[in-house]
Amino acid sequence: MLSYKKVLIVGRPNVGKSALFNRILDTKRSITESTYGVTRDLVEEVCKVDSFKFKLIDTGGFTILKDEISKIVVQKVLSSLEKVDLILLVLDINEILLEDYQIIERLRKYSSKVVLVLNKVDTKDKECLAHEFHNLGFKRYFLVSAAHCRGITKLRDFLKVEVGEVGIESGADIKVGIIGKPNSGKSTLINYLSGNEIAIVSDQPGTTRDFIKTKFTRNGKVFEVVDTAGIRRRARVNEIVEYYSVNRALKVIDMVDIVFLLIDVQEKLTSQDKKIAHYVTKKGKGIVIVFSKWDLVDESKGYFEALKSHVKFFFPILNFAPIFRISVHKRIGLDSLFKESFKLKDQLELKTSTPDLNKMLNLWIKDYHLNISHKIKYITQVSTNPVKFILFANKIKNFPNSYYNYLVNNLRKIGYKNIPILVELKEKIRDLK
């Protein structure tokens, strides 16, 4: 069973915690892996918002009563605070009582993961009361009415961004994420992949703000492809939909082996494309730059080569990445895209032994004259997919970046040609005798 991030709902009795719990769960949606306790215990549900999941935990009312049951309830709440990822503190916007202040004081040490939820905002007129709660010191807050379902969608969207987890099913040979701006051709490509020409294994459709996950077979290999909703340029950083669109794309990148960065050939490259490229490289994922809608281009001689040169200038960090042109409508370049995916996956899984690496390293060192104060000790590959090496030197301060690039270029020649190569520098402390 997957271990989901946990969201704890706390508050005194009668502030609407259970009503909020049920609204967030949204029983009209599919809820799985339920675990119920008795009334004095915590009530837990795995909540699914679109295709993202997290564990939602309802608690008994936090009270100053001294009876045995109340003390047990309070103790359970307090013991849970350390273990969860997010705390929803529910207050009644109409009144704040002594018990509320006691809870607030207990939560001070966890303030970084506390989100204030002001409930019973049943009418727009009550929204003006929110300013009375600003001095409580919690930066994030939501105005909701669990009874009338006001503000719930915004809260659910926030939760799936903040703590939502999504996992790709096992059993795929290659996992590919399709990333790009709206209208870059992602949906057309995914529809082609899931069409009659391909044997579909399974589909998982999402909404326009979610993603579509498709599993199919190609040349005897099982592909799993995730198509995200388009990444928009953020006009307003605080706008949750824009925050979510980028956050969702980053989560997809984390899940997959290879990213197809889809770019409409008629559009300009943007800073958002560059940010995604940096993140992919940082994570060591395979990446293919794909220019879509090639059938709409009046291609002159040398146009594609000029385009590739422009991309390498705009994306110097991706000078290793293959660049393709496709048209789903005209069936241009699709087979080549699949073949490239196989090649990249093989490179991501390549492992070179430490003895072989160091034999080559000795040859490389002879051809490059390092500053006498820097001496290379040895190199070892510590992981595949992502491919990562550790290079040990006598000191790493002011280590020449030119040698780092020289090393990476040589590693590309031994089989890691078109993937990100992560190299960590470590200082080798002289053995004491």
Swiss-Prot record:
Sorted UniProt keywords: GTP-binding, Nucleotide-binding, Repeat, Ribosome biogenesis
HAMAP family, per the entry: GTPase_Der
Phylogenetic placement of the source organism: Bacteria, Pseudomonadati, Spirochaetota, Spirochaetia, Spirochaetales
Function as written in the Swiss-Prot or TrEMBL entry: GTPase that plays an essential role in the late steps of ribosome biogenesis.
Binding site for GTP 1: 11-18, 58-62, 119-122
Protein name as it appears in the record: GTPase Der
Known partners and oligomeric status: Associates with the 50S ribosomal subunit.
Matches recorded under PANTHER family: GTPASE DER (PTHR43834:SF6)
Sequence similarity: Belongs to the TRAFAC class TrmE-Era-EngA-EngB-Septin-like GTPase superfamily. EngA (Der) GTPase family.
GO BP, one annotated term: ribosome biogenesis
